[in-house]
Design a protein with these regions (language model features):
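Aromatic- and Gly/Pro-enriched helix-to-coil junctions and flexible linker segments
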Residues: 9-169
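Internal/C-terminal transmembrane anchor helices
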Residues: 1-5
Length: 169
């Protein structure tokens, strides 16, 4: 029992069952595992959208918080609230506002996928180029948790990314 409890603390409450095949899950009366999809919600009034709340947070929720949340903190890092994002993890702060390439959050996304420090790790759904560009843009312009899209400079690189949110693509 203690080994199982320790595993739950380290790997999350579903670590023993997360990779069970659908047939075994069905036989045990468990729910099917939902396949992760890239869901981009259409934002009707994009200029008035809060960048963190409506653009950044959904990416972190879909791709990062399964390992970095209140119940499971890989690297002692939580990405589920602004306060914990600013706090960083066991290696220190993950955001260097205004300096995306000095920010661990961005650096780890850009590492070679074979690098042991690449995020997300093998077996997890990687971020799309648009999602990485969005996070880069957010950090580049201060990683502010309250600013609206209209309050940040929009260059040619981020325009198509933002357009995808305006169109729900």
């Amino acid at each position: 029992i203690t080994g199982h409890y320790g595993g739950n603390l380290t790997h999350g409450s579903d670590y023993l069952t997360a990779s069970l095949p659908a047939s075994a899950r069905s036989m045990l009366g468990m729910k099917e595992v939902e396949v992760e999809k890239n869901v981009v919600e259409k934002i009707a009034n994009l200029p008035e959208a809060i960048v963190y709340t409506q653009l950044v947070k959904p990416v972190l929720t879909q791709k990062c918080t399964s390992c970095h949340n209140d119940q499971k903190q890989k690297g002692k890092l939580r990405l589920d609230t602004p306060e914990f994002i600013l706090q960083g993890g066991e290696d220190g702060p993950i955001i260097s506002a205004g300096k995306p390439l000095d920010s661990e959050l961005i650096k780890r996304l850009l590492l070679d996928t074979n690098d042991e420090h690449h995020m997300p790790p093998k077996g997890k759904t990687p971020l799309t180029d648009n999602e990485i560009a969005l996070l880069h843009w957010w950090v580049q312009h201060g990683a502010d948790f309250t600013k609206k899209v209209a309050q940040l400079p929009v260059d040619d690189k981020i325009k198509p990314v933002l357009a995808s949110y305006a169109n729900g693509e």
